[in-house]
Amino acid sequence: MSNSPLLAALSRRVLVIDGAMGTSLQSCPDCHLDDWLGRENCSEILTKSRPDMIQRIHESFLEAGSDCVETNTFGANLLVGAEFDDEVVAMTRELNREGVELAKAACEKFATPSRPRFVLGSMGPGTKLVSLGQTDWDLMFQSYAEQARGLLDGGTDAFLIETCQDLLQVRCAVNACLKALDERGMGPEQVPIMVSITIEATGTMLLGSDIASAVNALRMLPIASLGLNCATGPVEMTTHVDFLCRHWDRFVSVIPNAGLPVLVDGQASYPLQPKPFAKAMRRFVEEYGVNIIGGCCGTTPEHIAALVELAGDRPPPERTPEPLPAGCSSLYGFTEFQQDNSFLIVAERTNANGSRKFKRLLDAEDWDALVSMGREELRGGSHLLDVCVDFVGRDGAVDMDQIASRYATSLNAPIMIDSTEAATIEAGLKRLGGKCVVNSINLEDGEKRLNEICPLLKAHGAACVALTIDEDPQAGMAKTAERKLEIAARIHDLFTGKWGLNEQDLLFDPLTFTIATGMEDDRRLGHETLEGIRLISERFPECGIILGLSNISFGLRPVTRAVLNSVFLHHARERGLTGAIVHASKILPRTKIDEEKWLAAEWLIFDRRGEDRPEGMDADFDPLLYFIGLFPEGEDAVEKVSLESLPLHERLQRHIIDGEDDGLPETLDEALAEMSPLDIINKHLLEGMKVVGVLFGDGRMQLPFVLQSAEVMKKAVARLEPLMEKVEGDTGRGSIVLATVSGDVHDIGKNLVDIILTNNGYTVHNIGIKQSLQQIVDALKTTNASSIGMSGLLVKSVTVMEQNLKSLNDLGITVPVILGGAALTRFHAEKRL
């Protein structure tokens, strides 16, 4: 339970934070160059040289009605001080203490029993970004910890880690504050930690993180509030504030600039005046449910007075946020554990124990080639990379530091850190700014492994894989469904109870064993794993379940393994499997597996022998031998269909459905002799894509094969597009901004619309995939287009479109909007949008 007066006040009403210290300093008539003591731009030194001026600025905002003032300590940390001189570094703790004392002295003049005033210890981002390798975690941690100690020395009411541009920097600063608090026997319940990130006009943080990535990466850290400040004015923050209020379950703050800066006589000037500023903020308080408002660059006491009038004694707004689904994130994007119509594909080849190529490149320290290998895995359809650098003779922590630092900025997928060594795991977590998954914990040595890893999970907000292994000397690796559930339940209780971690961040691995040995004890291991998945998913529906899939077929030939892996995956998903660590090439869609081989794989998995043997089989029927016998030496696992023998219209569709580009040019040339390019697309190729959509929706085709179909579709359209009749010149028919909405990477349908509209005389501005509403609005203003088109394949994209429409209305944008995508129905569009 919190005993923070600040949090108590926030539970009663909306609070107002002060305005810009920098703007106030620039306007001070008695601020002279000598006041900086030869350290120009080191504003913190003014706490020493001109305490009267700093306190006067605090008092000007308090007189305007501000509830909270920020200390003049934005850059008062070791790393920033080192850019000036050793004396500033030595004064770090003192500057922070005195900064708090000045602010407290000002607050005491205005505080009343019914209206207390609060000091927020300002902690800025510094000048070096840890994700870019400009400094490292340990140096940044020391820098922030010393600053936090000074702020606590002065008696700050809260830490405000603000203007954050790097999620890894946020996590480092939060942990430094926790360290300083722990040294005093205190916690964030007494001195809350507040975080404010900066979303640029591009719609992301400086390093490319969107608001969803930020919420996901920070939600498990013990921070009291999350908000936005700087970079833009309130209007440009609208969509991000809306998202934050809908998905963040604690206090929300909004501290914008006084509009976007303009140059006046060579100086940045902020044009938004106090009344329009407050008017733009009204929606955030009244509709969205923001708890804390204030001003950043360009805001004056007059701006704050306008906000105070807006807030009044308004009680805390009612908000019912919907937490983001369970998932993880890279710096650049959020990935749900539960994928739409698919499973979470975790690449297995970025692993020194599973890939000879990865091990060879790691041994050669060919870091660029290792990055390229990671990219290859993602191009194959993987959502995450399982990264393991453990092998004899190398320092795992050093190798993980090298690889993780490169993967963090070069790849857009989250990382699963796979190691038996806590030091290696920690090295990865200190380099990866998103929310990682740690692989793994177990009970092999009792609670020892959890005691090592769970503190790292808490400190870094990471999710975790848990293997169903315990300390039983005879049956430690759970092989029966009941044992798998028993161990899972024990881990769950420790994870959520003793360690206070969220069960949504727990993914159980109920263990996969080969069923291809022919040994009696191994025959039913596949069935037991499937039953274990069912029991665990029913008992712990909020947890994920993941498998090292290819273990099931270990010992078989590659062609045979692909079929068994695919059939086993199908049944595992039916019972609740969330994801699998597997190479995408080792999975086949059901449509490409001969029915006899599919059934034979099922007989092997479910051990259909003896009285349970399939009808018509002999009493000594052995499903393993039968299954192996279906794959003569040199035979392919995939059922081959001769496209040449099919009628033309069916052949066109099969090229798309099978993702087969061999012979595609010849098929298209034949079709062009009979029909127009547009008819080929609309009547045949799109019909093939519809089938792909149905198979994907039913779970009978996995994402990598959908992507293959998409590539063939792109090639076909690229060949047909130059042959389409095109209306030349400006027809006056209008123009449109086309975009795939935020969080969605699918663009086939959107690009087809682009081609068709362009060829019919419309002007199309196709701005690409994963476009935020701000990017769409910016494109609309830049192009002066007459309409907007939003596209998305995923179910969640419909929700994004719905929110975008609401925000467009809020922004007063009334141009026609066209929506499209596989998950969108006419009924939903007419009734909900």
Mark where each language-model region is.
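Domain-level signal for soluble alpha/beta catalytic cores
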Residues: 1-833
